[in-house]
């Protein structure tokens, strides 16, 4: 047995041990969750003022109109202001359609930026023009259930809760094999990862399609948020993760509200999906460094999770590279590694299907192949090109 074989088998053993420990600890924390945001208090009025921000850039008209209509249909009893910000679109048809339809609605503020400055700049412009107690960001390709504002606002009554997010669902789930996988990705990210993090008041990313923030918490952070840099360069993506980390750094809690459902359009082709994943991976690496610097504000579980996720990716990459290098050598190591990965994937898919009581998760085994062959190498590329701040999906639209 060669040195490469030994390294491959050791990496595999370490991966199995780490992944198993992580999932067991995560399951224990998910099962222990009783309050996903914070303790009830009278810090906010029963119906605080809510400002809903909808940044839009070259959005499809029907998609944007559907998004705005879902906000107008909220059952929330308090005052709502809706700010639609056109981020310098080259095609303003959808923005003008919304302006025309809601021109006489006093709840609306319409903002038109003279050039494309990015989602963060659009958010900042809306924040400066409003003064509500709570700020809800809704992506322009997202539709929210009618009780989302009510449920998110209710979860933020404790003064130490700075931000919360709702449950994300792929609106176009039935479009393709990929959208079905992404919908399952979202379910797992929300109902395993986020809900376990929420037990400790430390959801690490209040996802952009549907995230609510407390204005009094966010205001002192806006300068740092707006002018984020990484290695001396402006950082113009991953705004949701960065703002969440800044909230945690300032000592606020962040939470996940599974009953507040937001249905968002997801990539239905592999190329746009991979561009999105590349952007997200770079953002995650950038803010992981910041998160580890504020570990004193985080629970031991959150620190363990951050380390386990990154180390797990590294081990899986080593396993993949060694398997490929030994493919033609006659070694049994690639077979062992493949067997372990397939076996763990089957166990995971079956357990999730049983827990969720939804047997479509058996199909998620396809994602394991996608993860090993494409997403894990993509994460390595993201790390090697971490200084690249291009949005990618906009440039390709």
Swiss-Prot record:
Mainly resides where?
A: membrane
- Please tell me whether the keyword Coiled coil is annotated for this protein: no
Q: Which domain of life is it from?
A: Bacteria
Q: What is this protein called?
A: N-acetylglucosaminyltransferase
GO BP term, pick one: hyaluronan biosynthetic process
Instruction: Give the family, as the similarity comment puts it.
Output: Belongs to the NodC/HAS family.
This enzyme's EC code(s): 2.4.1.-
The family database entries (Pfam families) matched by this protein are listed as: Glycos_transf_2 (PF00535)
What does this gene product do? Answer: Involved in the synthesis of Nod factor, a sulfated N-acyl-beta-1,4-tetrasaccharide of N-acetylglucosamine which initiates a series of events in the host plant species leading eventually to nodulation.
- Fetch the InterPro entries from UniProt: Chitooligosach_Synthase_NodC, Glyco_trans_2-like, Nucleotide-diphossugar_trans
Query: What keywords are assigned to this protein?
Result: Cell membrane, Glycosyltransferase, Membrane, Nodulation, Transferase
Molecular function as annotated in GO: hyaluronan synthase activity
UniProt subcellular location: Cell membrane
Return the broad EC class.
transferase
Q: How does it sit in the membrane?
A: Peripheral membrane protein
According to the UniProt record, one GO cellular component term is: plasma membrane
């Amino acid at each position: 047995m060669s040195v490469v074989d030994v390294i491959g088998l050791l990496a595999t053993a370490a991966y199995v041990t780490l992944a198993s420990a992580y999932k067991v600890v995560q399951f224990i924390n998910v099962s222990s969750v009783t309050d996903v945001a914070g303790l009830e208090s009278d810090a906010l009025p029963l119906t605080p003022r809510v400002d809903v921000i909808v940044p839009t850039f070259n959005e499809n008209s029907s998609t944007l109109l559907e998004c705005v209509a879902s906000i107008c249909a909220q059952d929330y009893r308090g005052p709502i202001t809706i700010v639609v910000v056109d981020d310098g679109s080259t095609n303003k048809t959808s923005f003008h359609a919304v302006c025309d339809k809601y021109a006489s609605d006093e709840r609306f503020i319409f903002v038109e930026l003279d050039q494309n400055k990015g989602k963060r700049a659009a958010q900042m412009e809306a924040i400066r023009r409003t003064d509500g107690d709570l700020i809800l960001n809704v992506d322009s390709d997202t539709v929210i259930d009618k009780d989302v504002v009510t449920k998110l606002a209710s979860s933020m009554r404790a003064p130490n809760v700075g931000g919360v997010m709702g449950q994300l669902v792929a609106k176009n789930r039935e479009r393709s094999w990929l959208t079905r996988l992404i919908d399952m990705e979202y379910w797992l990210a929300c109902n395993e990862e986020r809900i376990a993090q929420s037990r400790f008041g430390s959801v690490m990313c209040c996802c952009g399609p549907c995230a609510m923030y407390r204005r009094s918490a966010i205001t002192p952070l806006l300068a740092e948020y707006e002018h984020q840099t990484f290695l001396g360069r402006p950082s113009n993506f991953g705004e949701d993760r960065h703002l969440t980390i800044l909230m945690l750094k300032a000592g606020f809690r962040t939470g996940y509200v599974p009953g507040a459902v937001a249905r968002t359009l997801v990539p239905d082709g592999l190329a746009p999906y991979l561009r999105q994943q590349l952007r997200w991976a770079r953002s995650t690496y950038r803010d992981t460094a910041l998160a580890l610097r504020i570990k004193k504000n985080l629970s031991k579980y959150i620190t363990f999770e951050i380390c386990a996720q990154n180390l797990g990716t590294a081990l899986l990459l080593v396993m993949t590279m060694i398997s490929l290098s030994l493919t033609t050598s006659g070694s049994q190591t690639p077979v062992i590694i493949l067997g372990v990965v397939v076996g763990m994937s089957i166990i995971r898919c079956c357990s999730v299907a049983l827990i969720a009581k939804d047997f479509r998760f058996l199909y998620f085994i396809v994602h394991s192949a996608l993860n090993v062959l494409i997403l894990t190498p993509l994460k390595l590329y993201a790390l090697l090109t971490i200084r690249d701040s291009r949005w990618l999906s906009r440039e390709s639209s």
